[in-house]
Amino acid sequence: MIITMLAFARARRGVLGISLSSQVLIVLCLMYLVMYIDRVNIATVAPRMTADLGLSNTQFGLAVSAFSYPYALFQLIGGWVSDRFGPRRALMLSGLVVCSATICTGLVGGVGSLIAARVVLGFGEGSAFPTATRALSVWMPRALWGFAQGITHSASRLGNVLTPPLIAALMAYTSWRGSFVALGLLGLAWVAPWWWVFRDDPRTHKGITADELNRLPPSRDSSGNAHSVPWVRLARRMLPVTAVDFCYGWTLWVFLTWIPSFFFVHFHLDLKHSALFSSGVLLGGMIGDTVGGVISDWLYRRTGSLQVARRNLIVVGMLGAFCFLIAVVLTHDLAIVALCLSAACFFSELVVAPIWSVPMDIAPHYAGSASGMMNFGFGIAGIISPVVFGGLLDLTGSWAIPFYGSIGLLLLGACLSFFMRPDLPFTETKAP
């Protein structure tokens, strides 16, 4: 991912050697990295945290899913705020809330306070990604929307990869509580650069050049959308995308929440080795994000078809993950399971760049609201998936049965993808 970012920056040199759009993309990558570290760190500390606080698998699943209630709600609210008032202030506020909630997680004393900390974290992170999509829709050329979505989400998966060994190292020097405090303070690193680099309207940035402006989409002021959002009509267009994102999100929440415990409990690995195996699995996802963005844009340039570039790639990703998760259930060899999980994570993450590009394709002027509607499905999956997985695990004692849920939803998501129409732009109607 780092090599890809440097190549992109060199190809688009501007002031100080890096164009402003590249600087915006780099800061957004840093934001995705930090926010995913703060989101998934709880999975790595799960064995120690549950023992220390006396939590069952079901209680831990409830605490994890508590994040997703406000997260799902603020997909819609945050997307609207970014369309109406601009991403600059909205994203800075999100960052401050996330860092505060992460620090507070290190201070919890039981399941109640843990749930409260996760709820606050969900408020902060819920608006972040629709807001980032709104920012990308005005700061990135349309031909690079897939790449931009792929590379930013690749940064989030880099956070997934780094989190297990990073948390394990911090726990060796402090404790699981100290690791949350340290990460919360570290998370402030991207907020100041964001405020300094980003402007809601590229035309208002003093460092922007005429050449760079000509490469960007036709500008529309992000900090004061003159039209109210046509919620009902837009929601109808986005409903199939929301359903597909739910199916994808169910599986991702399994990877983010339960894979470290799967290696720790099912294969009896120690914390260090379960963290390393988990990082290897999530590394496959990081690669899939970048590859998905590059392939999606390449397909669009080659065919001119958004159906091919977005929908078909989503179907390939869903079916690939479906096949490799079946292999996970059918084998008990640690090495084969780890490889199949990595491949499943790779294919599931091929979905990310094209599906996050779809709201920008359908409704570029309402990209924040449209992507919020889409990722509402991901948030709902986050509410249900960790609890159902943990509950089935407690009820049956089998890891295979919860995995079957992901397998079925991946197949359903591939089928539902054929109802998406990224090639049909959303037609606006002016508010009276």
Task: Label every model-predicted segment.
Residues 40, 68-76, 126, 160-161, ...:
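Residue-level signature of mid-helix packing/kink "hotspots" within the transmembrane helices
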Residues 42-43, 236-292, 352, 356, ...:
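Extracytoplasmic gate region of multi-pass secondary transporters
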Residues 54, 86, 107-113, 124, ...:
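Helix-breaking motifs and short loop linkers at transmembrane-helix boundaries and internal kinks
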Residues 73-112:
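Conserved MFS/SLC helix-loop-helix module at the cytosolic interface between two early adjacent transmembrane helices
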Residues 96-109, 316-332:
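C-terminal ends and interior cores of transmembrane alpha-helices
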Residues 97, 101-104, 112-120, 336-343:
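Paired small-residue
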Residues 117-157:
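Cytoplasmic helix-loop-helix junction between adjacent transmembrane helices
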Residues 152-205:
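Helix-loop-helix hairpin linking two adjacent transmembrane segments in secondary transporters
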